[in-house]
């Protein structure tokens, strides 16, 4: 929707906050605007604030908090000095125990409003580490000529700009405390204008940086990266083109993996592979999902969008057989290798685009007792519409977007005759508005 950012009244106004939006902003209705909704960054429910308008559109306005006149008892001082500028976190001003409560409300609202479903039970919110948890991410890199400096960080709330970060407390300390050193390193390079992003990922025994560069790195710049890696304990990968162009600069062999000790499983991965961001929450989530699935020794389980085998391989320790299906052929290859490395011969993997017709696929014709799925933000409706759903006793759906979960839940309950037994939020990304969730469906 087009927004008007040119000529409108930016005079600060006083208003009461009634709710929290799905993206972590306070919600107000201005009587002088005919009850028009205004989304106000930095505001919490129950507060009285003075806010400055920042954008207007036909159906809603946007503003930012300039003064809190009456604070919520749930308000806390943000730990990060960049809060309110950096878009990496938007909920640091909300007490930690209340963040999962807010996310539960977002989930339930989506289920009722979009899916027209209500769970029989609300699962307790699942939480893990709140600080230093982010083991995978991507920093934007930008040379600002007017300031004669290089910025490394996440985007600002205004996504046109890169936040000038001195630290990030949600990123693992090995990375979050070294952001200024990264910026200074790039600033001193010959190709400082040719590096648009730096990705980071951490295993249990190594931390890797992948440098996206638009032009070949000079020998001097390559040596600078190697020296930085040796001093700070990083592995460096270079990415001159697409994903397939990623290759190690130093060292040549990097043991990237993470362990799931409860199931005696070790998952190896590559520097741009998808892994769950929050290691402690991931382990709790797997325990939670397998318990909700009620996996039994004689079960055959289908695991869709299986990735590296994050759920598949723990399931293989519990059930008779598990089949994992994933759209990324590289991840499937790694999942097969992981199964072999862990001595699991009861896990099969298939590469398949789950947004396309799979009704004649070999894995689709196999019989299964239960289904676990962990789709991307777009959800799983296309594949759900093809599955022989009535053969599954139970479905556990792990979601990274409450809207697509709600849509798919509506399909399962209102069109396919399943019962939504329970659902609940999981705080994979503390201090952000991101809502991870899990839902359980049973055949009626």
Swiss-Prot record:
The record's annotation in InterPro entries points to: 23S_rRNA_MeTrfase_RlmD (IPR001566), MeTrfase_TrmA_AS (IPR030390), MeTrfase_TrmA_CS (IPR030391), NA-bd_OB-fold (IPR012340), SAM-dependent_MTases_sf (IPR029063), TRAM_dom (IPR002792), U5_MeTrfase_fam (IPR010280)
Q: Which Gene3D superfamilies does the UniProt record give?
A: 2.40.50.1070, Nucleic acid-binding proteins, Vaccinia Virus protein VP39
Assigned keywords, A-Z? 4Fe-4S, Iron, Iron-sulfur, Metal-binding, Methyltransferase, rRNA processing, S-adenosyl-L-methionine, Transferase
Q: What is its EC number?
A: 2.1.1.190
Set out the biological process GO terms recorded for this chain's protein.
rRNA base methylation
Q: Where is the TRAM domain?
A: 5-67
Q: Which residues bind S-adenosyl-L-methionine?
A: 276, 305, 310, 326, 353, 374
Q: Which reaction does it catalyse?
A: uridine(1939) in 23S rRNA + S-adenosyl-L-methionine = 5-methyluridine(1939) in 23S rRNA + S-adenosyl-L-homocysteine + H(+)
The record ties this protein, via Pfam families, to:
tRNA_U5-meth_tr
Residues that bind [4Fe-4S] cluster: 80, 86, 89, 168
Q: Which residues form the active site?
A: 400 (nucleophile)
Give, as one word, the top-level EC class. Answer: transferase
According to the UniProt entry, its GO molecular function terms are: 4 iron, 4 sulfur cluster binding; iron ion binding; RNA binding; rRNA (uridine-C5-)-methyltransferase activity
Report the function annotation for this chain: Catalyzes the formation of 5-methyl-uridine at position 1939 (m5U1939) in 23S rRNA.
PANTHER family under this entry?
Answer: 23S RRNA (URACIL(1939)-C(5))-METHYLTRANSFERASE RLMD (PTHR11061:SF49), RNA M5U METHYLTRANSFERASE (PTHR11061)
Q: Which family does it belong to?
A: Belongs to the class I-like SAM-binding methyltransferase superfamily. RNA M5U methyltransferase family. RlmD subfamily.
Spell out the NCBIfam families in the cross-references: PRK13168.1 (NF009639), rumA (TIGR00479)
Q: What is this protein called?
A: 23S rRNA (uracil(1939)-C(5))-methyltransferase RlmD
Q: Which gene encodes it?
A: rlmD
């Amino acid at each position: 929707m087009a927004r008007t950012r040119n000529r409108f009244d930016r005079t600060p106004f006083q208003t009461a906050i009634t709710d929290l939006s799905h993206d972590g902003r306070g919600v107000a209705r201005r009587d002088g605007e005919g009850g028009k909704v205004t989304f106000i960054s930095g505001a919490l429910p129950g507060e009285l604030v003075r806010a400055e308008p920042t954008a207007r559109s036909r159906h809603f306005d946007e503003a930012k908090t300039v003064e809190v006149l009456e604070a919520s008892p749930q308000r806390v001082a943000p730990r990060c000095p960049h809060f309110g500028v950096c878009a990496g976190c938007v909920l640091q001003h909300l007490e930690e125990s209340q963040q999962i409560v807010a996310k539960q409300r977002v989930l339930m609202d989506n289920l009722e409003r979009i899916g027209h479903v209500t769970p029989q039970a609300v699962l307790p919110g699942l939480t893990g580490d709140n600080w230093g948890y982010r083991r995978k991410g991507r920093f934007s890199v930008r040379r600002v000529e007017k300031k004669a400096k290089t910025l490394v960080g996440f985007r600002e709330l205004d996504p046109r700009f890169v936040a000038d970060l001195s630290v990030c407390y949600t990123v693992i300390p090995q990375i979050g405390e070294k952001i200024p050193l990264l910026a200074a390193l790039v600033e001193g390079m010959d190709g400082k204008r040719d590096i648009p992003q730096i990705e980071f990922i951490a295993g249990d025994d190594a931390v890797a940086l992948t440098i996206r560069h638009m032009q070949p790195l000079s020998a001097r710049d390559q040596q600078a990266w190697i020296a930085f890696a040796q001093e700070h304990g990083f592995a460096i990968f270079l990415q001159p083109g697409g994903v397939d162009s990623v290759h190690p600069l130093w060292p040549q062999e990097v043991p990237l993996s993470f362990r799931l000790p409860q199931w005696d499983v070790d998952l190896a991965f590559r520097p741009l592979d998808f892994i769950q961001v929050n290691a402690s929450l991931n382990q709790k989530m797997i325990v939670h999902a397998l318990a909700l699935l009620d996996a039994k020794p004689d079960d055959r389980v289908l695991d869709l969008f299986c990735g590296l085998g994050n759920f598949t391989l723990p399931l293989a320790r519990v059930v008779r057989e598990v089949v994992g299906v994933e759209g990324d052929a590289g991840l499937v290859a790694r999942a097969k290798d992981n199964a072999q490395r862990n001595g699991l011969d009861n896990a099969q993997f298939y590469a398949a685009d789950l947004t396309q017709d799979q009704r004649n696929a070999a894995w689709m014709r196999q019989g299964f007792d239960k289904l676990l799925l962990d789709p991307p933000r777009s959800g799983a409706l296309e594949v759900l519409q093809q599955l022989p759903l009535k053969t599954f006793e139970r479905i556990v759906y792990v979601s990274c977007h409450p809207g697509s979960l709600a849509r798919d839940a509506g399909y399962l309950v209102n069109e396919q005759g399943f019962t939504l037994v329970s659902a609940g939020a999981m705080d994979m990304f503390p201090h952000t508005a991101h809502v991870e969730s899990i839902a359980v469906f049973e055949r009626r």
